[in-house]
Amino acid sequence: MLDPHPDLTSGVIHGLGYLYALLFCMNAYWAVRSFKLGYHFRLPKSLGGQDVPSAGPWAMYAVLLLLVALAHFVSAGRPDAFLIRLPGWLQDLVNVFADPISYFALSTVLFVAMIWLREWWVKPTAAWVLLNITLVSMGLAITDYDFRQIVGKPDNVP
């Protein structure tokens, strides 16, 4: 049966491909920056306990984003069969916390945490991780038709 309001369309999948390609470029730059600055971290003893350049995980994450972007570019033919979308269990979890009382309480707790941890949040790597989490979460949320309709309303777009 034809769904009049599909969660994914070819245009949405293709557009998200550009988002993930942009994220790839940003994180590839971050990996190069980390390599040039010479940042390292020590693995836990259970994994060998050796120093690893921090550019390594960033480069792997950037390659993962490139693969996700390529999947979006080449798989836009059958939107109903596309696998990279907001999981139903996560959508249900968000809906549980979206009622007014939980939303207010969670927003207040997060606001207090942001103020309390403000010195940690402004460190470059912490801010970069937060930006990545936000953009990937937005990319997944855009795969939901209802969310797309809410954020695309003229009163929500500058």
Indicate residue ranges for each PLM-predicted region.
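Alpha-helical transmembrane segments of polytopic membrane proteins
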Residues: S10-F24, P57-A59, V94-T108, N156-P158
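Aromatic-anchored segments of alpha-helical transmembrane domains
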Residues: L65-H72, N132-A141
